Amino acid sequence: MAKKGKKFQDAAKQVEALKAYAPKEALELVKKIDFAKFDATVETVYKLNVDTKQADQQLRGAVVLPNGTGKEQTVIVFAKGAKAEAAKAAGADVVGDDDLVQRIQDGWLDFDVAIATPDMMGQVGRLGRVLGPKNLMPNPKTGTVTMDVEKAVADSKSGKVTYRTDRDGNVHVPIGKVSFDVDQLLGNLQTINDTIVRLRPASVKGAYVQNVSVASTFGPGVKVDFSQF
């Protein structure tokens, strides 16, 4: 494992490794010890007691953070006719059908969210090898395959984030920027916690949430006492 730099080590010294901090205290500490020269993203990681080989124990979806993400999202929409016009009116950055599919096949990927109406998925499906690995493929589970393109665009522009368990049962979700007030970060973290707890698979035995931490982009993780939510 690569040796961490001095700034990281200095930041890590301010974190009690074995302590689980109250949620607000943990976020205050993340802001305090951040050393990035830009407005770093704050992320939470949930370690869950799930078997991701079991389909019913895989979490995937999307949620709108009450205080946004602090990032301007570039949103594209695959749609035709009236739905294309509705997407444009809702603020989508790029709207198209076969022409947009071809543009992406030609290598254009300068966007953060892709939305599609169901009737476009036959064409959009051809982009699976390109969009899938980047988690950009429209999916009904994340609300990005829908006839309600107005809501999908509005949600994406106002702080919608997606989540999914990785192979080890971890869920990584951005909850804002270091520049956010602590209460803004806390509100977003509470929303993520409520969502994950609500989605506990019925087949999970024993403790469901095993560990929660928060960190800035380059900063050390701070363990959260999730019993205090």
UniProtKB/Swiss-Prot annotation:
Ranges annotated as spanning the membrane: none
SUPFAM superfamilies attached to this UniProt entry: Ribosomal protein L1 (SSF56808)
InterPro entries: Ribosom_uL1_bac-type, Ribosomal_uL1, Ribosomal_uL1-like, Ribosomal_uL1/biogenesis, Ribosomal_uL1_3-a/b-sand, Ribosomal_uL1_CS
Cellular component terms per the entry's GO annotation: large ribosomal subunit
A biological-process GO annotation: translation
Keywords linked to the UniProt accession: Repressor, Ribonucleoprotein, Ribosomal protein, RNA-binding, rRNA-binding, Translation regulation, tRNA-binding
One Gene Ontology MF term: tRNA binding
Disulfide bond residue pairs: none
CDD domains: Ribosomal_L1 (cd00403)
Record Pfam families: Ribosomal_L1
Keyword rRNA-binding part of the UniProt annotation: yes
Subunit structure: Part of the 50S ribosomal subunit.
Stated family: Belongs to the universal ribosomal protein uL1 family.
Protein purpose: Binds directly to 23S rRNA. The L1 stalk is quite mobile in the ribosome, and is involved in E site tRNA release. Protein L1 is also a translational repressor protein, it controls the translation of the L11 operon by binding to its mRNA.
Protein name according to UniProt: Large ribosomal subunit protein uL1
Organism listed in the record: Pediococcus pentosaceus (strain ATCC 25745 / CCUG 21536 / LMG 10740 / 183-1w)
